[in-house]
């Protein structure tokens, strides 16, 4: 079993004092991206892409990104265990997601592997100002919004960095069903 159970996290004593952020690299220049991280006080970037490279934006390939961030004094960590591109299970409890990628990721969220990786984010964020990064510019089109939901139910505040003018608190997905630390997305009138 992972460190969190019965609504309380074993790492509660080391909860982050500041929100964990989410950000998408999109097609930004590396200078603009680093500027956005600095503007938001990010000291550690957590890469949650399944494939940590970009054909169209090579500045966000894992090696080049890590080098650029190191030059700016920002730590880089790759968290493969939070990567997207998951397939839905036939017996999915997450049929509220019409998007099969989100449904597959929501199914993965029920696993011990996912829980352990979320616990790792919480541990890292206890001593660093972290941002979860994927490729999509906006969080509502990216699996990082589901990771943010998982952090919220563990009592960890999350802010979504949209651009230089917008940083806003993440809100739990409207059709999420929460039981303790478990989140499902059942079908219903508000389903996505």
Where are these regions (language model features)?
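Residues lining hydrophobic/aromatic ligand-binding pockets adjacent to catalytic sites
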Residues: 1-192
């Amino acid at each position: 079993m992972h460190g969190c159970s019965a609504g309380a996290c074993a790492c509660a004593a080391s909860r982050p004092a500041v929100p964990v952020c989410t950000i998408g690299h999109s097609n930004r220049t590396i200078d603009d991206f680093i500027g956005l991280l600095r503007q938001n006080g990010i000291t550690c970037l957590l890469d949650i892409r399944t494939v940590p490279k970009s054909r169209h934006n090579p500045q966000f390939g894992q090696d080049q990104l890590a080098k650029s961030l190191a030059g700016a004094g920002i730590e880089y960590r790759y968290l493969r265990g939070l990567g997207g591109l998951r397939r839905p299970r036939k017996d999915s409890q997450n049929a509220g997601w019409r998007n099969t990628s989100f449904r597959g990721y929501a199914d993965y969220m029920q696993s011990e592997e996912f829980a352990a990786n979320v616990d790792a984010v919480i541990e890292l964020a206890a001593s660093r100002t972290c941002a979860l990064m994927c490729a999509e510019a906006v969080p509502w089109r990216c699996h990082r919004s589901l990771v943010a939901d998982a952090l919220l139910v563990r009592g960890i505040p999350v802010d979504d960095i949209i651009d230089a003018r917008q940083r806003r608190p993440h809100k739990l997905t409207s059709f999420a069903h929460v039981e303790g630390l478990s989140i499902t997305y059942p079908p219903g009138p508000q389903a996505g």
